[in-house]
Regions:
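Alpha-helical transmembrane segments of integral membrane proteins
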Residues: 20-31, 278-298, 331-343, 373-378, ...
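Intracellular coupling helices
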Residues: 4-12, 16, 294-335, 395-406
Length: 517
């Protein structure tokens, strides 16, 4: 207890420098922990599914005039079924998922829900290993106008009412019956819909093409059987042969198509942008934490001149070097604890801004499985900030009580100051580069002027309905002009192959259907 009393008195006596320590470490811990947790969050993508190592994603490769394109996530509709049919010994399940046919909102009565939905076949939950809480998707998703909701969306829509059997509306077009509930998926998953609509609902209305000649708009996944050792190269070679047997062989086209598989666990993590951002985030977090630790060490060692006599007094009263060392560790622990309290206050008060900047909820970042990240950061800071100065203080001799301490040698300060200034210069330079890139992207010429333009997704069954809506918007006094297009440039466009007169593929091009203006 005496040690705690002496430590508290020491902290109160040097409260000016200790306030600086708490502020410095609080800000550094906030930033570094957020950055490190974000990296771990990114690296844990697609681990929420059951046995994720058995799930593989299909990718399409188009070749035109001998030029092979990059693998793309969108596949021809029948590919997943062909894989399941031709590899019964290896593949347990396969699924086709379409996103673009489920872009519209869901309605419960007049209440609109713009939650992420997809259309998928009956093997969706079995293939991805998503827990189904109620309902039989193998049977129900073979019927049209059927939907399964996540427990999160079901709670949002119906509260404590039983959602099964209720009828909701998709985009004012389809009446969907809720047939089941499944466990909601976390944010760090590439396929995490809040609603799964039976894809039969689209096929029965001819909303999309289902053939080997087009309609490559489907995300597709396969699940290998337990115990199957997947040699990706050999499997892809066999898959290429299977796909070739299904493709039309009319001899007129100079293009070809094949599919490959990649482990779902690696698809997101292996992206160039993800790897680059993780590297930058990790370096920035380490730099911030290192600078804060060096700042703490520098402030602590700087107090050596006026704390040396106090340490000597403790030793005259029987304190050993270990006791002095433990007192300094306790002091460091209290400072770090106060810094953690400051960090929590910052996270709570700036939560909305942090979540908007990081594009993920704090509750998703700080789950139980990632608590080790802040613990490791705090432990590392405690070792660097407590052990190094603590050993210096514990070695002060008893004779220091009878001497006037003068700080004759200052060479030890210069390396620390150099490292600190170097780190600050690095972070400032990195932030300047990031701000310059942000300014460039924000002001880059996109080819169109987005000022005073409002966009919305509206689907019409006929040209007459579209024209009527256009006349309505044109009649509004605050509207200058109205235009409609199948794929606005700010959203993206679909693609199609351009043929010559003989039917040979020349190239693939983006296209957009628009009205006369």
């Amino acid at each position: 207890m005496k040690q705690i009393y002496y430590v508290i008195q020491t902290l109160l006596r040097g409260r000016g420098s200790n306030i600086i320590k708490v502020l410095s470490l609080g800000l550094a811990l906030t930033m570094s922990i957020l950055l490190f947790v974000r990296v771990v969050f990114e690296q844990s993508y697609d681990t929420c599914y059951r046995d994720p190592d058995r799930i593989y994603q299909l990718f399409s490769i188009f070749t035109i005039n001998g030029e092979q394109g990059e693998p793309g996530e969108l596949n021809l509709p029948p590919v997943a079924g062909a894989v399941l049919e031709n590899f019964p010994q290896e593949v347990e399940a396969a699924v086709s998922v379409c996103k673009y046919m489920a872009f519209g909102p869901l309605y419960n009565g007049s209440v609109r829900f713009k939650d992420y939905a997809v259309m998928a076949d009956s093997l969706f939950f079995q293939t991805l290993g998503i827990e189904v809480l109620r309902g039989d998707p193998l049977h129900e998703l073979q019927q049209k106008d059927v939907v399964f909701l996540s427990d999160r969306l079901a709670q949002k829509m119906f509260g404590d009412e039983d959602p099964v059997g209720k009828v909701i509306n998709y985009d004012k077009q389809l009446q969907l019956t809720v047939k089941g509930i499944y466990a909601a998926l976390p944010e760090n998953s590439t396929m995490n819909p809040e609603a799964v609509i039976s894809i039969v609902s689209a096929w029965s209305r001819d909303w999309a093409e289902y053939s080997w000649e087009g309609g490559d708009s489907f995300f597709q996944y396969i699940r290998f059987r337990p115990g199957v050792k997947v040699d990706v190269e050999k499997f892809n070679a066999r898959l290429e042969t299977v796909i070739h047997n299904y493709l039309p062989q009319d001899g007129k086209d100079n293009s070809s198509y094949t599919s490959i598989v990649k482990p779902l666990r690696d698809v997101y993590r292996s992206g160039d942008m993800v790897k680059r951002m993780n590297a930058i985030t990790l370096i920035l977090g380490l730099a911030i934490l290192f600078i804060a630790a060096m700042n703490y060490v520098l402030i602590s060692i700087s107090s050596l001149s006026y704390r040396a006599k106090a340490v000597g007094v403790h030793k005259c009263n029987g304190a050993s070097g270990g006791t002095v060392f433990s007192m300094f560790l306790l002091e460091t622990g209290i400072v770090i604890l106060l810094s953690l309290i400051l960090m929590v206050l910052l996270l709570l008060n700036f939560r909305e801004m942090i979540e908007e900047t990081m594009e993920v909820r704090l509750t998703s970042l700080f789950v139980f499985g990632r608590i080790w990240v802040p613990l490791v950061v705090v432990l590392g800071l405690f070792i660097v900030g407590g052990v190094l100065p603590g050993r210096m203080f514990s070695r002060i001799p008893v004779s220091q009580v009878f001497r006037h301490y003068t700080e004759g040698k200052k060479g030890w300060k210069r390396p620390l100051l150099f490292i600190q200034f170097l780190g600050v210069a690095f972070i400032c330079g990195l932030m300047c580069v990031i701000m310059a890139q942000y300014h460039y992207v924000l002001n880059k010429n996109t080819g169109y002027d987005a000022r005073s333009i409002a966009t919305s997704d509206i689907y019409f069954d006929s040209d007459s309905e579209r024209d009527a809506a256009r006349q309505f918007f044109c009649g509004l006094p605050y509207v200058e002009d109205v235009e409609s297009a199948s794929y606005p440039p700010c959203i993206g466009m679909s693609g199609m192959r351009i043929m010559d007169e003989s039917g040979q593929s020349l190239f693939s091009s983006r296209y957009c259907v628009e009205t006369e203006n």
